[in-house]
Amino acid sequence: MVGCVWQAGRFEIGLDKPKIMGIVNLTPDSLSDGGAYSQNAQTALAHAERLLKEGADILDIGGESTRPGADYVSPEEEWARVESVLAEVAGWGVPVSLDTRHTVVMEKALALGGIDIINDVAALTDEGALELLACQADTGICLMHMQGLPKNMQINPKYQDVVGEVARYLKARAAECIAAGIAPQRITLDPGFCFGKTLQHNITLMRHLPELMAETGYPLLIGVSRKSMIGELTGETDAAARGHGSVAAALAAVARGAKIVRVHDVKATADALKAWEALGINL
């Protein structure tokens, strides 16, 4: 596997121990927090600061909801949502990730400075995205697998071999990045839980994360926090109340080799990981 350091802009993030990526949603239609942080920048910044105090290693800031059935958001609207928050946190001296699939938004953020990671649910397939990132010397990249688009991805997703198909797609996208001149240590991969997958597909992927990591050869970033699979597993219909199940799923991912977990409930996840380590469980 590619080494235990993720080159992410201004930072070399050690992956010898699992890292926590804290979520800052700036979307008014977020299922997980009801758009609580989309009303004004100060509310969002206070939330981001709290996540860091609770143990987040990375802040992941996004302005487009990619939940199942979500409507398309123009790059202009997305940028209007994230610009002021990105401009502020870029000066905090912590790793900052931008969750976007739009080249225009990536370009504006990178020109702003202080953005260390592009976290892309579309794996740099938007026109010009791959070329833009290839021109950056150090920006970290997370490539995610998604079958379909957010609007339709949960309408009857099908696979012959979900682990193999996800692995082959991600491996191919990473290879295209390498061919474009992107250094392998800049790349992490996300299998895309709940992005064009049924509950059984998600369970199968979780159980086979070691094989997925071995097949692709890259560190895995896992995002299952408050998602529909947690609701289906626990019976909890309120996304905001899925924290306990989300922590359990994050631990399951780490136990199977995940290097970064993207979460809403940072303190609970950080405490759980600390307890595991103190109890001698190999993370």
Swiss-Prot record:
The keyword Magnesium applies. Pfam families: Pterin_bind (PF00809). It catalyses: (7,8-dihydropterin-6-yl)methyl diphosphate + 4-aminobenzoate = 7,8-dihydropteroate + diphosphate. (7,8-dihydropterin-6-yl)methyl diphosphate binds at T66, D99, N119, D190, K227, R262, V263, H264. Changing M229T: In strain: 418. One of its GO terms (molecular function) is dihydropteroate synthase activity. Changing T125N: In strain: 418. It is an enzyme of class 2 (transferase). It comes from Neisseria meningitidis serogroup A / serotype 4A (strain DSM 15465 / Z2491). Changing K151E: In strain: 1014. Changing P75S: In strain: 1014. Its cofactor is Mg(2+). Residues 18-274 form the Pterin-binding domain. It comes from the Bacteria. GO terms for biological process: folic acid biosynthetic process; tetrahydrofolate biosynthetic process. This is Dihydropteroate synthase. CDD domains: DHPS. Catalyzes the condensation of para-aminobenzoate (pABA) with 6-hydroxymethyl-7,8-dihydropterin diphosphate (DHPt-PP) to form 7,8-dihydropteroate (H2Pte), the immediate precursor of folate derivatives. Changing Q147R: In strain: 1014.
